């Protein structure tokens, strides 16, 4: 996929959350400039300064700069003279958005822009009415499935592998895939509905499979370990770091999990993809990071981003049926992607136990998830009361048929209790009857006077009643 000539010569700024306290919010801004253009000038209150070069790829130069803004209801920065207000106040009342699944597997960039990005526009209107301080993006920020096949040697991925690649072939494939990934990100970042939010609300993002390719980590080991597979992963990882973290350099290999401690709040984002294999969800580094971010002492509230739902129906029943009968074999990778897979049950219990222990220790813990293109909520009983999971998916992905949502709802009625004496239950959204709501959606988390609540915004039905969490 070539870089479209119709793209503007400058795209951005995009804001990334780097930290904050009672006095300031720490940020990073990213601006893409077509090669040959002047460096963008950033003014964060101390006069304009040229933004340093972070990366160059596919005909664009990417400029990134770290800066801080004082805590305020409407702090301001400017890029090339265009000013943007940011709500940097992190103490007291707080509004946080959560989105996931920003695209579709096939033909996503061919969709009508206004239709595709209708919920981004709705999120922008919600922000304009009552500003957000943070936007969390929980996975599948792009659907790069087509980009992984952007070179003839990759056209059959993942079923038809080309065999070992020479150094020249690897370089050629890398360049083709890098160009395709870059074109997709730039096209999406240039969309006005996304750009409005991205310049005004700093984001913290964690990837999932479609940011690489459908089912990454749950595919056959020979595909994951092939020269083509490792090249695809390297391209996707570099693209994630640049576009979703604003980092142009390379980082040490391993998991990309991260957490931020803010006033009264920790945001924890485990990486469930970098070390994933058919037989595991996380490797040693991922578990080291996750154990640390879920350990006490912690602020009074922890939001845990699990790109794949941690509390869900008994999908292992469906997985058993597929494995025994061979029916619906094409869904085996999707089923193995789930925490509930037979292959991951021990890890799932370990993850749930860490969540439960943190919650029971006095830190109110809430799981945020996406991935399923539906909205729902769930609870797991703990000694300190119910631990909530809130699922919002997707902001751009077309919802599945109602029959699929009903089937999942029937499966959810079986219940599940991977931890003895701590049953998991799935629930309808406030004011709704079905367990799963099949409308495009995003989630708003609000802290008011120290109390937290969640509100889903649904494309057709509007905002739900608040759910106290």
Which role fits each region the language model picked out?
Residues 1-469:
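Metal-dependent phosphoester/phosphodiester hydrolase catalytic core
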